[in-house]
């Protein structure tokens, strides 16, 4: 069977679902997950989300993040993370995530890891679950986004050294999905670095 979409997204964690929600509503999007849509590491994450406290906090946020990564991070990527963090948290709030508030009704920022100031927003001790549930609800309300659960991404479809889709296996049936764009949001990024013994 062949299927044609504008965007094929492999993975239903925060990266995959948030990507789907940030695409143009006119695009036909297919999100593929190997299990149920809620069976992701996002759902299991307990901590919070780092966010710059304001424009003046961005340089310190960048430095804290670089230091935590032993300066192996790509500086440009860390700068984007820091600069866009406030807008992304606002968007998550607009989608319905109810981050914890302090006694004055403001976001309750906590401190984790290598951060030198309180800049972590959270929902109790189940931030990942809250984010996942909100994103799943939002994706399910978008008519241009289709979800394939219990579906395996087997391989990419390549033509002239360019990815033009993916081969899926669903209910023992092969589905060739042709897409203008393919987003691999499969998790496990931390495992791609060669480890050293110290």
Residue ranges and their predicted role:
Residues 40, 83, 108-111, 156-158:
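Short secondary-structure boundary/hinge segments and terminal tails
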Residues 99, 112-114, 155:
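Catalytic phosphate-handling regions of large nucleic-acid enzymes and associated NTPases
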Residues 71-75, 106-133, 190-192:
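Helix-loop-beta segment of a Rossmann-like dinucleotide-binding subdomain
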Residues 1-65, 101-103, 124-198:
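Residues forming the flavin
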Residues 69-108:
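Rossmann-like flavin
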Residues 54-56, 73-74, 86-90, 113-117, ...:
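Short alpha-helical interface elements
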């Amino acid at each position: 069977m062949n299927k044609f979409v504008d965007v094929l997204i492999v993975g239903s964690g925060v990266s995959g679902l948030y990507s789907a929600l940030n695409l143009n509503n006119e695009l036909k999007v297919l999100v593929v997950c190997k299990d149920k849509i809620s069976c992701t590491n996002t759902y299991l994450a307990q901590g919070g989300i780092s966010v710059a406290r304001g424009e003046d906090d961005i340089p310190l946020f960048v430095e804290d993040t670089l230091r935590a990564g032993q300066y192996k991070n790509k500086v440009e990527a860390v700068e984007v993370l820091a600069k866009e963090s406030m807008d992304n948290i606002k968007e998550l709030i607009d989608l319905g995530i109810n981050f914890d508030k302090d006694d004055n009704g403001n976001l309750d920022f906590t401190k984790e890891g290598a951060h030198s100031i309180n800049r972590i927003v959270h929902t109790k001790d189940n931030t990942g679950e809250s984010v996942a549930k909100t994103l799943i609800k939002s994706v399910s309300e978008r008519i241009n986004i289709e979800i394939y659960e219990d579906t395996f991404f087997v391989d990419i479809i390549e033509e002239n050294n360019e990815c033009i889709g993916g081969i899926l296996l669903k209910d023992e049936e092969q589905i060739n999905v042709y897409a203008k764009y393919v987003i691999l949001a499969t998790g496990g990024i931390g495992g791609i670095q060669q480890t050293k013994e110290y």
